[in-house]
Amino acid sequence: MGTELMRICVKEDSDDLPSVPPGFESYATFTLKRVVPATTSDKAKTPAIESVSATEQAKMEVESDEAKAARALRRRPWINHSGCDDDGDCAANNDNAASQNPDQNCDVKPALPKGVVRGCEECKDCQKVTARWHPDEARRPDLEDAPVFYPSEEEFEDTLNYIAKIRPEAEKYGICRIVPPPSWKPPCPLKEKQVWEGSKFTTRVQRVDKLQNRSSMKKISKLPNQMRKKKRKCMKMGMDSVTNGMGDPCSASTGMNELETFGFEPGPGFTLKDFQKYADEFKAQYFKKSETSTDDKCKVDNSIDCWEPALEDVEGEYWRIVDKATEEIEVLYGADLETGVFGSGFPKISSSHNASSSEDKYAKSGWNLNNFPRLPGSLLKYEGSDISGVLVPWLYIGMCFSSFCWHVEDHHLYSLNYMHWGAPKLWYGVGGKDAVKLEEAMRKHLPDLFEEQPDLLHKLVTQLSPSKLKTAGVPVHRCVQHAGEFVLTFPRAYHAGFNSGFNCAEAVNVAPVDWLPHGQIAIELYCQQGRKTSISHDKLLLGAAREVVKADWELNLLRKNTVDNLRWKAFSAKDGILAKTLKARIDMERTRREFLCNSSLALKMHSNFDATNERECCICFFDLHLSAAGCRCSPEKYSCLTHVKELCSCPWVTKYFLFRYDIDELNVLVEAVEGKLSSVYRWARQDLGLALSTDVSGSKMEIDEEGKVHKDPTPQTTALSGKDLQLKVTSKEVSKELEKTSKLSHVNLLLKEKEEQITSSHCMKPVKEETVCDSSDPNVSACQPSEGGIICMTAVKSASGKKNSQSLPNDVILLSDDEYDIPRKRGSVRRDAISSGKKLEIRERPTHVLALEASAKIAAPICQREGDSLRDTRNTISLPTNDQKTMRRDVPSSTSHAEVNAEATGLTQDICNRMATNSHGGGKPTSCKSKNSGGLAIVDVVDGTRSSSGTPSCSQNNSPDRFIRQKGPRIAKVVRRINCNVEPLSYGCVLSGKSWCSRRAIFPKGFRSRVKYINILDPTNMCFYISEILDAGRNSPLFMVYLESNPSEVFVHMSPTRCWEMVRERVNQEITKQHKAGKSDLPPLQPSGSPDGFEMFGYSSPAIVQAIEALDVNRVCTDYWDSRPYSRPQVQFPANPLLREANTSGRSNVGNLQLNPGHHISPTGINSILKVLFKKASMEELSSLQEVLSETNSDMVTELVKEEIQNRR
């Protein structure tokens, strides 16, 4: 019970001391009266005697007037002579003199008689309530009620959706009440006997009369001699407490430190059963009608009239006590009880199977406050730790008059409060738009308290009458919460209230997307006030953005129309709350970086920088999830970008900056959130680790709660997923893997040799670089695709023009992924930076080559190609990039490996492999602009050549005003059947799965065909198109069409029909454009349905269909064969019927590819078929085959193969 001593020490009764030296007080009046010496009875007063009424005290003073004192002859009553006396009597009287003659400049409130006395000699849990309610002086505020909502059963199913629905109506009030449907009655585990009678909780002592009307603590103790008096008094009380077993004397000095602030002291512990008894006794005694009572305080129940005051009476009495109390009213409140320790009032999901279906329903409900913070759509799901009171609910067990003072939620979050049982709880709310008005009104009415504690509203210990707020122009609304009802508070809405009796409520926070702007304001205020944060706002903001990108990816590419994806898709808009908040935050970050970080070292922040513990600025406690500043003098000490100069006194050159993302990457994220599909594609691959192909790394993928995909890489895999997964390879291995068309993407790499050792603190630095791709270079060899770009190899020559002999086989690997939405500026080749071969660096650039735009319900990314002129793999050329900041990382020379961040990109790798074999060169360079064709943006990628002026050679910005207006192009009125002469190039292999076939056709992976159609670049001519089926990942095919003469023109979709429909739309777009330019002899606009996608792929050709059917020997394509129960494959076809030489321009007739028993394949065909088979085999299988062929007769092998074929048939 040492807390009792603390409470006594902080008391202000009879401890009010003047603020000037004794004997020099100035009095308002000069009434002469005799000085009354202290009597023996005065010294022996007990706390019970001190609580007598003011009338009795006046009577005692009149009776004591008869006593004579030697010093009563002094004629100067305005001078306090008691301070000059040396005898013990006058010294003992100093306290009384100080309390009777207060300093006029120190507005210390006079002591009030005790209205509640807790504990006695017989028991410590009883109470004596001497105060009585004053119905004639009630001060019930005249307020409007907050809105009440009654959701239907259907509306009640989706918690956050319903809150979003009522927000426009309720937010202006700051608070509202939600009454669940009558059928929603969750069981309460707290009412179980073992909890009700066995679990104890702690309470807080609240002085209701001091919530509004109290003096500043600084005015109570100003002088040292007065402090000594209070200390002596506390020590004396401490000794008495020790005698009574209540504490120890040293506790008194501890209490002295708390004189500087006002707060709620800890109270005794109770069980729910005992606290209900205590609360009911208080209310019954305070509001009882009759004055009859027994002398035994512990049996006060016998004299209580059993009646319940009206709620209006309780409200009026409460605000009378707060406004103008006549007694000390002390109550207890079980506030902020952690449900993780004491237990929740809602059922939790149990691992046992004994739970009933009804309990399971409530345990999984979105209105269960244990589930509420992390519901789908709440940003708090991205907070990994269980923050008590924010993500873990708190319990509030109240009694009559127990209060919660004016405050807003941490980070201005939403809060939801549910009352499990008990008397009503009265709430008062002020809308977020009026929060500043309330703060100004409270500072005006309580200036001394705010001067002493500027952050007083953060302490939750100050109340102010709603009537006074209303007078000050602050709109306040009342809300009465009953058992079984919810109360919802909105962001930055101030709220306060009290309980009208014994009750139990539970509350927790939530953060829907519309909270983000309020949360941003909150952290800026916290930074100014130097207040600690509870959650990482930037982490939640980026988590929401990633979720939107992931939803866009799954909806557009995987057709996952789930409820969660549709919910997040709704936030994917340029003018949406998420996009605006993210853009504002990035603009703020850009400004700070440009202002501070231009001349300093910038490093890549590790992904686990704040994974285990929150990183905060050591100056203002700003969250450091996105960026931080540090110094070498203190490795574990960081600051925000604003306070980097105050971090330490070291020179500026010793400082460094940590960035989770560079600004270009963040800009990509903004575009992705705004709905730009190219940015969605790039960010999904770059940050989330999502890819359309999973063949490259045969690894398992797991998606965490933030939407990131984590893969478990295999030892042979060189293509990695995720930004932070790194693979070390030697330069020879890099060269070898590139020759094997290794799948490397996502990161721009610039590898150089390094002679000196570089410390880890110099691992990344911002650099600028412009490069140009020169197609006239005879050393142009091959390009590998990166994410939206390509990897090119070229020999780096020294300044003398000779090839650097120290360079490795593929000296420089530059992965450029620049996407240009505007005409690019001319750059210069930075060969001087890499010719010396003295440093090994890694340079990263954001992706800028893929351009995808969502213009249909379902679309897929365009995987582009660059460079029409591709030859043998020998050297590397630089690719054009924007003039932009990039990040450079120096790698220590002690290792012979390059740390390569890479990502699996099976789709782009497959495209690139065919670029080297199918490209004939000579294609016209086109500008890298997105052209909306109705289904997807068609991307023209700038190839190796471009004009020196930087102007695109084929611009799409032709204005209609530049040409004479003509009538529009003709439209074909009849859909004519195109004579499709489809030429199969490769039949591929059949895969099992419903997505790899339909009732109409089988879709073999790797199938390729060739057909002639209108040229999208020159509609007056026809050209050849290559149709191909790729593996899109997630066990589904992806259909791709591209120009054989210009592989940079790519059309990709999940449907063959839609894929060719996009080609038709692009043709019509070009026809319209050239018609406006005045060109004649143009074909008519192609109507919808012409051409047919299945026909253009070759599925109308019986020979091709039969060849594909023959591939499915085991009939794994069940949907296709179920629709053809009497069909069976007639003959086997080779998987690769036609392998053309790269330099062959002739066309082979492949109509008669059917193999008869006597058919002989040419030696070239045999080699090609064997190569295909060998590539499908593993190293172990190839080694075994080599041993068998070297030691066994070939005839035996032939017989075994024939036997196996017969068995499989």
Swiss-Prot record:
Functions as a histone H3 'Lys-4' (H3K4me) demethylase involved in the negative regulation of gene expression. Active on H3K4me1, H3K4me2 and H3K4me3. Not active on mono-, di- and trimethylated H3K9, H3K27 and H3K36 in somatic cells. However, also active on H3K9 when in complex with MMD1, a meiocyte-specific histone reader. Together with MMD1, promotes gene expression in male meiocytes in an H3K9me3-dependent manner, and contributes to meiotic chromosome condensation by triggering some condensin promoters (e.g. CAP-D3 and CAP-H). Zn(2+) 1 binds at C617, C620, C640, H643. It catalyses: N(6),N(6),N(6)-trimethyl-L-lysyl(4)-[histone H3] + 2-oxoglutarate + O2 = N(6),N(6)-dimethyl-L-lysyl(4)-[histone H3] + formaldehyde + succinate + CO2; N(6),N(6)-dimethyl-L-lysyl(4)-[histone H3] + 2-oxoglutarate + O2 = N(6)-methyl-L-lysyl(4)-[histone H3] + formaldehyde + succinate + CO2; N(6)-methyl-L-lysyl(4)-[histone H3] + 2-oxoglutarate + O2 = L-lysyl(4)-[histone H3] + formaldehyde + succinate + CO2. Interacts with MMD1 in the nucleus of male meiocytes, especially on pachytene chromosomes. Keywords: Chromatin regulator, Dioxygenase, Iron, Meiosis, Metal-binding, Nucleus, Oxidoreductase, Repressor, Transcription, Transcription regulation, Zinc, Zinc-finger. Its EC number is 1.14.11.-. It comes from Arabidopsis thaliana (Mouse-ear cress). Its cofactor is Fe(2+). This is Putative lysine-specific demethylase JMJ16. One of its GO terms (molecular function) is SUMO binding. Changing H407A: Abolished H3K4 demethylase activity leading to early leaf senescence. Belongs to the JARID1 histone demethylase family. InterPro entries: FYrich_C (IPR003889), FYrich_N (IPR003888), JmjC_dom (IPR003347), JmjN (IPR003349), Znf_C5HC2 (IPR004198). Fe cation binds at H407, E409, H495. The keyword Iron applies. Pfam families: FYRC, FYRN, JmjC, JmjN, zf-C5HC2. One of its GO terms (biological process) is regulation of DNA-templated transcription.
